[in-house]
């Protein structure tokens, strides 16, 4: 990925860290979590729940799948600030040598998720997202490390703002073919959508930060890196019992029945009696 150039420094997003042991760039971790969120949506949620979500948001399943990947991939955009990046000694030296270091004094802890919430509200506003939707989806990202005390910290530096723009565009290209859109959200849908999206994000981030994906930096350097991560995600979900069991319905009465009177429960017997009284012969409905 090409870096942006501002003044005398030449750095790119692949040099900014999201994880340090082992190193993962913000782009690698973002793509990993985005793919995991998509796989959780497609494989963990029951088909009926997916259909209900699509109906609530008025979109097709492939559209919401793309959006979920894009949205989840941006969850750590708040780490793209000098005050966070400089927490790692090696990065602080690099920032100093590139005149990117900004002194920071604050007695409270820096919470990257809260910073990310504020960054995304502004970015999505610029991209034309509806106010209710952008506030909700940014707010969910702001809660993905729920319960932690600390502050959102934005240093409003032009080079770092360029990093934010580049990161958002990179994730949009990766998951949404560079086309921005955000589903509309009605007031009475906010609670259900918040619970579902927050759950998917927390689970995806937890899995993506674990040992099963510690080599994601190497995987994404391969030509088929995306496919490998999808397979790895499916394997993790399957081995750990996260996949929904498919519900199969018989298309032949003979496979499922008949239910004989002597083995029928009370409801079955009542149905039999109704059919007998109105003298209808043939197939029998049963529960």
What do the PLM-derived regions correspond to, one by one?
Residues 75, 286-287:
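Beta-edge loop/turn motif
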Residues 4-253:
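Accessory nucleic-acid engagement/destabilization modules that flank
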Residues 247-284:
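Conserved pre-motif I regulatory segment
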Residues 138-140, 282-285:
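Beta-sheet entry/capping signal
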């Amino acid at each position: 990925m090409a870096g942006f150039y501002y003044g005398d420094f030449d750095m790119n997003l692949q040099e900014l860290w999201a994880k340090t042991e082992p190193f993962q760039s913000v782009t690698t971790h973002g793509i990993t979590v985005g793919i995991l969120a998509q796989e959780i949506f497609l494989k963990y949620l029951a088909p009926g729940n997916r259909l209900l979500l699509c109906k609530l948001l008025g979109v097709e399943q492939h559209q919401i799948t793309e959006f979920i990947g894009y949205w989840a991939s941006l969850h750590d955009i708040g780490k793209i600030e000098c005050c966070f990046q400089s927490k790692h000694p090696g990065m602080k030296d690099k920032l100093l040598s590139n005149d990117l270091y900004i002194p920071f004094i604050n007695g409270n802890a820096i919470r990257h998720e809260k910073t990310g919430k504020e960054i995304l509200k502004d970015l999505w506003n610029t991209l034309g997202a509806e106010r209710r939707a952008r506030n909700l989806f940014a707010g969910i990202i702001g809660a993905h490390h729920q319960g932690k005390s600390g502050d959102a910290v934005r240093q409003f530096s032009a080079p770092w703002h360029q990093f934010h723009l580049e990161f958002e565009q990179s994730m949009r290209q990766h998951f949404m073919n560079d086309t921005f859109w955000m589903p509309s959200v009605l007031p009475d849908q906010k609670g259900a959508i918040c619970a579902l999206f927050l759950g998917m994000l927390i689970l995806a981030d937890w899995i993506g930060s674990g040992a099963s994906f510690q080599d994601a930096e190497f995987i994404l350097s391969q030509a088929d890196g995306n496919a490998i991560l999808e397979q790895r995600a499916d394997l993790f979900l399957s081995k750990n019992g996260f996949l929904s069991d498919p519900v199969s319905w018989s298309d032949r009465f003979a496979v499922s029945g008949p239910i004989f009177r002597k083995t029928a429960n009370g409801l079955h017997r009542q149905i039999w009696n109704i059919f007998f009284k109105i003298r209808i012969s043939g197939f029998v409905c049963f529960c």
